[in-house]
Amino acid sequence: MYYGFDVGGTKIEFGAFNEKLERVATERIPTQTENYSLLVDDIASLIAKYDAEFGVEGKVGLGIPGMEDAETGALLTSNVPAAKGQFLRKDLEAKIGRSVKIDNDANCFALSEAWDEELKDSPSVMGLILGTGFGGGLIFDGKAFSGYSHVAGELGHSRLPIDAWFHLGENAPLLECGCGNKGCIDNYLSGRGFELLYAHYYGEQKKAIDIIKAHAEGDANAVEHVDRFMELLAICFANLFTCFDPHVVALGGGLSNFELIYEELPKRLPKHLLSVGRVPRIIKAKHGDSGGVRGAAFLNIKD
């Protein structure tokens, strides 16, 4: 039995999956935002409850909006303040008497897609989230790859490439990132970036959904903006694809519902790739909001 926990800023979602990777139990509880001991107790209590229900000790995986320090194991997270700087994996292991896997929630999203029936035989899957922020996860042979310092999936904190700057023009905004650097692609490729760039070029604040609607209606500014953004996506994605050469790319987050992306990227990518580079299959993520808990559970599949 595989147990997955999607630990968010307001709620913890639990899911239990059997050996066929079918979800057989679900539960949601509020996240303890201030009391760390209660946070650990809440997770441990759910584990004990479902161990008793299923008569086995489930394998436990946690997905978090952050990462473990690769040297100390301390948790780096801002969305779950009670756990910031704490040793959640080690403390939970001591509490329940078994090993626990923990990973970034974007890696869990990618892992969930990689273990979909349609993709599970793909040697590599890249998950990219076009949501409030831009992030991603890398899956090789069914396992999440976190790298030496646990930052391998932090694709949003790579910098905007030089040809993207040329594309955006000499008055392109140099945006500061929450990580402390400037020019991180998180601020440009996310849904938030989609809106910020529109406001920068046209002096008008609009929600992404309204820009997309205006584009469909033929509004000149929206049409120009979407064309610029699609080319920006192609330039930045081509950089990532040249580095990692994934077989399949699954897109999630609110902006991934913009169907034009799946028409435009295959046409725009080739000129930005190496001459021998191939455009990977680009699909919309299938598991939506349940992806985090699925992926967390599946951290234990290939021990």
UniProtKB/Swiss-Prot annotation:
Pathway: Cell wall biogenesis; peptidoglycan recycling. SUPFAM superfamilies: Actin-like ATPase domain. GO terms for biological process: N-acetylglucosamine metabolic process; peptidoglycan turnover. Its EC number is 2.7.1.59. InterPro entries: ATPase_NBD (IPR043129), N-acetyl-D-glucosamine_kinase (IPR023505), ROK (IPR000600), ROK_cs (IPR049874). It comes from the Bacteria. It catalyses: N-acetyl-D-glucosamine + ATP = N-acetyl-D-glucosamine 6-phosphate + ADP + H(+). Gene3D superfamilies: 3.30.420.40. Zn(2+) binds at residues 157, 177, 179, 184. ATP binds at residues 4-11, 133-140. Keywords: ATP-binding, Carbohydrate metabolism, Kinase, Metal-binding, Nucleotide-binding, Transferase, Zinc. Catalyzes the phosphorylation of N-acetyl-D-glucosamine (GlcNAc) derived from cell-wall degradation, yielding GlcNAc-6-P. Belongs to the ROK (NagC/XylR) family. NagK subfamily. This is N-acetyl-D-glucosamine kinase. It comes from Aliivibrio fischeri (strain ATCC 700601 / ES114). The lineage of its organism: Bacteria, Pseudomonadati, Pseudomonadota, Gammaproteobacteria, Vibrionales.
